[in-house]
UniProtKB/Swiss-Prot annotation:
This is UPF0266 membrane protein YobD. NCBIfam families: PRK02913.1. The keyword Acetylation does not apply. Its main location: membrane. InterPro entries: DUF986. Pfam families: DUF986. It comes from the Bacteria. The lineage of its organism: Bacteria, Pseudomonadati, Pseudomonadota, Gammaproteobacteria, Enterobacterales. Keywords: Cell inner membrane, Cell membrane, Membrane, Transmembrane, Transmembrane helix.
Length: 152
């Protein structure tokens, strides 16, 4: 097993750990989930570049008669990238004392102000950071508003 294979195994394990954390562990942290809202995906250009580069590496490894283990590991890496970028849906998860946004826990008392832009983006101003929350379904903004009013 080469260093390349070990690095591929490390990256696959990291992506798998992230996927498991995102799907199964994060919704169970910090109490029961009050509301889970699907968000719009950010630009897919990065994901296309990543999966395309891995596909080029697979092609190069196959045509140069490289190790089969490396080909399988590259294929697994491409599948993990495909899952994370195209199948998994980003979510905002509201709990009793705060919410998870982009896998970061934010307590409600950190919100200094909230605004709704004309194009349906909820803007939350924190102490030093601004969150731009783009929901997939515009009706979910009303659910978020009701939940925040109930918990404040």
């Amino acid at each position: 097993m080469t260093i390349t294979d070990l690095l591929l195994i490390l990256f696959i394990a990291a992506l798998l750990a992230y996927a498991l954390y995102d799907q199964f562990i994060m919704p169970r942290r910090n109490g029961p989930t009050l509301l889970s809202i699907a968000l719009l995906r950010r630009g897919r250009v990065d994901s296309v570049i990543f999966v395309g580069l891995v596909a080029i590496l697979i092609y190069n490894n196959v045509t140069s008669h490289g190790a089969q283990m490396t080909t399988w590991l590259l294929s697994a890496l491409a599948l993990m990238g495909f899952y994370i970028f195209w199948i998994r849906t980003p979510r905002i998860i509201f709990k009793q004392r705060g919410f998870f946004f982009a896998n970061v826990w934010i307590e409600y008392n950190r919100i200094k102000e909230m605004n709704l832009s004309e194009d349906g983006v909820l803007v939350m101003q924190l102490e030093q950071r601004r969150l731009l929350i783009r929901v997939r379904n515009i009706d979910d903004l009303e659910k978020i508003y009701k939940l925040l009013i109930e918990n404040q």
